[in-house]
């Protein structure tokens, strides 16, 4: 969320940014919020004027009463009473206007970084990095659920009876591989100096609106009926929420955290055959990384975060590439973002396995996450990135490590988490 003062003083910049994001329908919001803010500030100024006048009159009343001029003092008291009523009305007006301003400000997108390519949607994202040589073997690569079924490793039919579409049971070697990937990702990030955290898996509405837009919330979040609680769609939400209304001394920064959690999302539906199976589901697990830092350090940490993910995939010999998200593909709070994609030998193309985002002070402003510096307090910058998100990681892993006989190679990095196995063999 932008600062209303910035919007007042840079209305044309804000409008141009909206155009860059191809959200022209939001252009009228800029003038509307400026007008509402002017009205709100006028109400504040009038209230301040009345309070100053009330203090002055109160002193005069005391002096008149001391002089025995009771009648004149009572007349002034009537003025104070009348002003108190007006102050009450002004306070109500200020609150209502402030709420309207906040609601609109939450809909106005953050100013994108100058380096972000201009484009309407993800089809115009730009490749900025590639690792590994994509290989298409001369034997057929089955669909990922078909591979899992040869190991008796998945049961979506039973999950459908229990919970409906978008859920699964993982079993045996496939379940163990799932846990191995998560455990390896955790240790990988700990070895890079990140603090491991297991956060709450539910958050309150004030945290939800602090970390994401209303549109994202409506599309993603499951609400707990009768409670002010939502199931998290990613541990980033509860991790950033950890710092709500806090002030952290500069010398304690940066805060570099890696977190594990299950994630719950409403998104599921007609996304095409390539998103059947476990590609897009209601429940999955993820290892995340979050950084809270000084503003001048967020560009550095942005590059470090996405490179961590690429490095992890490199240790597993999975070809990956990194795409810079174009302006139209950025969520409103994001200033800059990249998607990390893994190679799919079966589809003969890359697919998304994670994303990294710099939100600068957008979340910090909403949640009042501040830094204590020599010259006072100021807003922190927040960043987040996916370390690894099974089961999408499993899709990439199985396809890239599948042998012609149906067995799957286990790279050295994962063997300690798989009981020393260098290969898993299908049962069917």
Outline where the language-model segments fall.
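TRNA-recognition modules of translation machinery and tRNA-sensing kinases, especially anticodon-binding
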Residues: 27, 130-428
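N-terminal alpha-helical targeting/anchoring segments
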Residues: 1-134, 149, 153
